[in-house]
Amino acid sequence: MKDLRVIFFGTPRFACEILKALIEEKYHIVAVVSQPDKPVGRKRKIMPTPVHELADAHGIPVLQPAKLRLQADEVLAYQPDLIVTCAYGQMIPDVILDAPAYGCLNIHPSLLPKYRGGAPVHRAVMNGDEETGVCLMEMVHAMDAGDVFARRIVKIDEEDTTETLNLKLEKAGCDLIREALPGVVDGTLKGEPQGENYTLARNIAPEEEKVSFAAEDVNVIYNHIRGLIDWPIAYGVIEGKRIKFYAVRRKTEENDHVPGTVMGFEDGCMKIACMKGYLYVKELQPEGKSRMDAKAFANGAGRALTGKVFE
């Protein structure tokens, strides 16, 4: 079974951990397909994707097509018996999906059929869900619609962000692929149809990054902010400038303040009045500045915002 020729598709850290599990389990990874490397940081230095970096470390050939459908022949030249994908980032064309004798499998970070699509982890946190999970599923021509072979439930704590939840899901996904893949390949583990009662987890739109203090209560705002950590990061606008929110907590308490009012700084946090409570911002990034803690911000220009109102 582990002599099967496997091609792995993936890009970010989450996918990197799944690839690492396959390598540790001695599967024969003949090639890896990842998104093109991109410039990062202020110096815009080209950096390899996490999956690219891991594949290089193990001497595995890497393909990084900008448009996969135009380079399908290069992928199929590796004659895969099985394809495994996780957070790749492009639609895989039918000519590739139909090629492997053992099919194409995907590790998806939600409890399908809930949250098909590109941002299932973000949406679970933003919606205040108490649990999510990972599924090992068959890839079909419709997005995230294939039969589910196995799943694992993961609890979402109140303090979890998308960043911390991804770490939990990475571990669950690695455990799942180790336990379930042999049964899928030898035919002893059968898939279950998802049915038609599904929900979508659309990608985060730029306009969703802005927090609306006037329209949402403290619980919605808190979930919104932690759902966008560590990317793309939620922000508020005050005095015409953006402030990004990196670490927050909340306190539920009825009050008569105008939502979005900066009440001052206490316990190392910027305190903002919201409907049904207060938001405490511990780490932030003022427009044009570096990320800092709220205490440092207060000692600079921050305290002058007391009494001002976020849009």
What would you call each of these model-derived segments?
Residues 1-232, 277-280, 286, 305-311:
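One-carbon transfer enzymes
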Residues 214-311:
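An anion-binding loop in the catalytic cleft
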